[in-house]
Amino acid sequence: MTSVNKKEIEKFSKMASEWWDPEGKFKPLHKFNPIRIQYIKENITKNFKIKNKTKPLSGISVLDIGCGGGLLSEPMSRLGADVTGIDASDKNINIAKLHSKKNNLKINYLCSSPEKL
């Protein structure tokens, strides 16, 4: 059994170049992302009783499954987390790697599925 859906991979691979366009096909994710990041950050810091304000996720490992272009991975890294992002699309992983490199972020991106980890 696999969680990989080939049609979904093809669909998102075709849109890979648009991941970082806030007015493109991923506009809803860009609009929703700040709320999602805040929610994740608040829950991690609360549950792990973290007091560090500058890098509140320092020392935390994050696995972003289905990371796409890295819209969640990058903010988690900026907050101090050690991030691994996986996606079944090579194109998405390549976009994510290029974007994180431009922004001097150390994120481990892998073209993989959860079952292969």
How should these model regions be labeled?
Residues K31-S58:
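Conserved alpha-helix/loop element of class I SAM-dependent methyltransferases that forms part
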Residues L63, L71-K116:
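Class I SAM-dependent methyltransferase SAM/SAH-binding core
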Residues E8-K11, G69, E74:
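Short coil-to-beta-strand
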Residues M1-F26:
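N-terminal, positively charged/glycine-rich alpha-helical extensions of SAM-dependent methyltransferases
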Residues S58-G66:
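Conserved class I S-adenosyl-L-methionine
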